[in-house]
């Protein structure tokens, strides 16, 4: 009431016309979510009224598609991709120079770890020879676990800066990223970074690039992303070397070189054809989609339809990343930008990466784009809320993060020990670790994560094959003997690069992890490239940490899927008073059973409280006990009230206590707190 009186007094004192204009204007809450607006406000958002163009939008609208350049930066981890991106953004005036540090590393986990885990995009305007060019930059991850991000990024690009550290030279993921870019037909520009370091050897790095990749290094650019040395030479090279045409995204079934055209892909006069490249969740706007416009144009208020789901949406806002979300009145063919819908998507699963959108009514006139190849999850963990009441919160948090990372697989799972949870699939152990950090940092989720495991293939005697990702689905002993022909495990081809002096230690490590050597070559007199075929199960068991320890941190690792091979695979279980603890079971190779079994019983004993009866902790494979520990019971002194009684009376009381403990052990339930599992499963 007081607020109404104040508003009335203000209106009476305001100049003429103010009150009338205020009463005519619709009243909209400033903080109301845009995707839950009323029908009246939605109708207003679809009106054809246009706002005055900003100076930025006027410059962009004047640039023809022939002067668009889409490119990315690819390199090994820590070779300076994000720092170089900062310098390019400063050079084009997109951000203010000075205090910028990894502007495109927007996640907390990226800034903490100092690595890029999520491909980020940004549009820039650069004047070259008196003409404006619209440049679209993608900063890609370097680690092998995020290769799906890199592969999707290439679909938006016509070329790439191949970045190599002058002091380290070519590393394992430099090789992997080169071949991925080469296979997709990208124009590659060699760039040597960190030339200002005392240990820099740019000539050696150039020689490596020339010999390993057969690249023309005469026009390579020597830069220091940290100081900005020679960075101004990069963008003219990008404009001159990278073509204005782009690529269609990779076919969903075959990784073939992408279709390259002699003229720019994209025609503003054709019906809209828009590719969904990425998506993320905003608590205010809902699902935000990163899109590439192949044909036509898109504006706020227009209605579009998805080819994948058939669902229709009104566009609430369209814009570019500059480097943050910057609204524009229109996105045209050749541009990469963002959109969100009003009302928003009701379920996060509606945003399917690789989906094609067009204007409603033009479905038959537009051919959908092929989409992306779906990555296969190869590392699995189970995730449970610490408090069972927080299950729904954990489910919402996982769904929002999966919206931003579609390479993760999610299945609901239940455990007698830990309750309802999820089985999550990842591309690697770092991928899993980053997801766990994001759950805790961005959503405040308190979770219990089981150790990573890999899938196994069961070949039944009737000829059927089945992929098993959960220990709960692994066949029991009797079924193994009678119905299973063989069990196979996945192998990978690992590429390791390191100084020659550590060759003996690295070979010893690989052999100890059931590896088989495939090749050994020197790409310089002091640098070795070693290829080994390794079981994926050994790779996820902290193999990279052991490799770093053996080489004092100088080794790098990359790997790719190889084949399934027959192995002696078993299910290792933890038993507490002969009852299996399902949350701790793992599928392992028989060579790991004794080591893991002893570790389990020793560690689990530390976290089990004493009971009134004896608690027996065992590690077992089938009916065979591998290791055992015992938690002694509380001891009640039944002889305390006896003084000088006879020996037979004492013996009778002790025998009675012994019988009582046997009955307790037979019928009593061992109480194991959630915190015990949390401590046991902690790394």
Curated annotation (Swiss-Prot):
Q: One Pfam family of this protein, by short name?
A: GTP_EFTU
- Mind listing the UniProt keywords for this protein, alphabetically? GTP-binding, Hydrolase, Membrane, Mitochondrion, Mitochondrion inner membrane, Nucleotide-binding, Protein biosynthesis, Transit peptide
Q: Which GO terms describe its cellular component?
A: mitochondrial inner membrane; mitochondrial matrix
Any one Gene Ontology BP term: positive regulation of translation
Transit sequence range: 1-43
What is the membrane topology noted in the UniProt record heading this document? Peripheral membrane protein
- Any idea which positions bind GTP? 75-82, 139-143, 193-196
Q: Which residues form the tr-type G domain?
A: 66-250
Q: What class of enzyme is it?
A: hydrolase
| Alphabetized GO MF terms | GTP binding; GTPase activity; mitochondrial ribosome binding
- Family statement: Belongs to the TRAFAC class translation factor GTPase superfamily. Classic translation factor GTPase family. LepA subfamily.
Q: What does this protein do?
A: Promotes mitochondrial protein synthesis. May act as a fidelity factor of the translation reaction, by catalyzing a one-codon backward translocation of tRNAs on improperly translocated ribosomes. Binds to mitochondrial ribosomes in a GTP-dependent manner.
Name assigned to this protein: Translation factor guf1, mitochondrial
Native species:
Aspergillus fumigatus (strain CBS 144.89 / FGSC A1163 / CEA10)
What gene name does this entry carry?
A: guf1
């Amino acid at each position: 009431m007081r607020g109404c009186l104040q508003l009335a007094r203000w209106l009476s004192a305001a100049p003429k016309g103010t009150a009338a204009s205020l009463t005519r204007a619709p009243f909209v809450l400033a903080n109301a979510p845009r995707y839950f607006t009323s029908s009246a406000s939605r109708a207003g958002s679809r009106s054809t009224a246009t706002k005055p163009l900003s100076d930025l939008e006027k410059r962009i609208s004047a640039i023809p598609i022939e002067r668009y350049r889409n490119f990315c930066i690819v390199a090994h981890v820590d070779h300076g991709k994000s720092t170089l991106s900062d310098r390019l953004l400063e050079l084009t005036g997109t951000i203010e120079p000075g205090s910028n540090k990894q502007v495109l590393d927007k996640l907390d986990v990226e800034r903490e770890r100092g690595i890029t885990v999520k491909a980020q995009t940004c549009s820039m305007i650069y004047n070259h020879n008196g003409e404006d060019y619209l440049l679209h930059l993608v900063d890609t991850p370097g680690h092998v676990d995020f290769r799906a991000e890199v592969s999707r990024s290439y679909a938006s690009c016509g070329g790439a800066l191949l970045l190599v550290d002058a002091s380290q030279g070519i590393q394992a993921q430099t090789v992997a990223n080169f071949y991925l870019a080469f296979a997709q037909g990208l124009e590659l520009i060699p760039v040597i970074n960190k030339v200002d370091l005392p240990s820099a050897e740019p000539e050696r790095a150039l020689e490596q690039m020339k010999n390993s990749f057969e690249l023309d290094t005469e026009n390579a650019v020597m830069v220091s992303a940290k100081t900005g040395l020679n960075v101004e030479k990069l963008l003219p090279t990008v404009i001159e070397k990278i073509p204005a045409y782009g690529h269609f995204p990779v076919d969903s079934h075959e990784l073939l070189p992408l279709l390259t055209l002699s003229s720019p892909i994209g025609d503003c006069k054709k019906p809209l054809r828009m590719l969904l490249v990425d998506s993320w969740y905003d608590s205010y706007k809902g699902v935000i989609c990163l899109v590439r416009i192949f044909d036509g144009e898109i504006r706020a208020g227009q209605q579009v339809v998805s080819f994948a789901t058939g669902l229709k949406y009104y566009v609430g806002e369209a814009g570019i990343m500059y480097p943050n979300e910057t609204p524009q009145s229109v996105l045209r063919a050749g541009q990469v930008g963002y959109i969100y819908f009003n009302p928003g998507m009701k379920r996060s699963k509606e945003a399917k990466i690789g989906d094609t959108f067009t204007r409603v009514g033009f479905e038959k006139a537009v051919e959908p784009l092929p989409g992306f190849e779906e990555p296969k999850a190869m590392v699995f963990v189970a995730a449970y809320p610490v408090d069972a009441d927080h299950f729904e919160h954990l489910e919402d948090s996982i769904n929002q993060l999966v919206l931003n990372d579609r390479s993760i697989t999610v299945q609901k799972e239940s455990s007698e020990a830990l309750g309802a949870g999820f089985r999550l699939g990842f591309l690697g152990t770092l991928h899993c670790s980053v997801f766990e950090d994001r759950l805790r940092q961005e959503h405040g989720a308190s979770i219990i994560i089981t150790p990573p495991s890999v899938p196994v293939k069961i070949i039944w005697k009737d000829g059927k094959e089945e992929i098993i990702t959960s220990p709960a689905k692994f066949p029991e002993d009797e079924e193994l003997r009678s119905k299973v022909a063989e069990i196979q495990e996945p192998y990978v081809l690992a590429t390791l690069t390191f100084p020659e002096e550590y060759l003996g230690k690295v070979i010893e490590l690989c052999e100890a992890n059931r590896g088989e050597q495939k090749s050994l070559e020197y790409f310089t007199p002091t640098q070795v490239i070693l290829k080994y075929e390794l079981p994926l199960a050994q790779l996820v068991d902290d193999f990279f940490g052991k490799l770093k320890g053996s080489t004092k941190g100088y080794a790098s690792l990359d790997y790719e899927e190889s084949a399934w091979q027959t192995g002696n695979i078993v299910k290792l279980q933890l038993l507490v008073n002969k009852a299996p603890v399902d949350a701790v079971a793992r599928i392992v190779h028989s060579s790991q059973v004794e080591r893991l079994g002893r570790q389990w019983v020793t560690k689990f004993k530390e976290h089990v409280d004493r009971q009134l009866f004896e608690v027996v902790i065992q590690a077992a494979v089938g009916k065979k006990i591998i290791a055992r520990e015992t938690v002694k019971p509380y001891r009640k002194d039944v002889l305390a009230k006896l003084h000088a009684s006879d020996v037979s009376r004492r013996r009778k009381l002790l025998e009675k206590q012994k019988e009582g403990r046997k009955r307790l052990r037979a019928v009593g339930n061992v109480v194991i707190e959630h915190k015990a599992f949390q401590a046991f499963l902690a790394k």
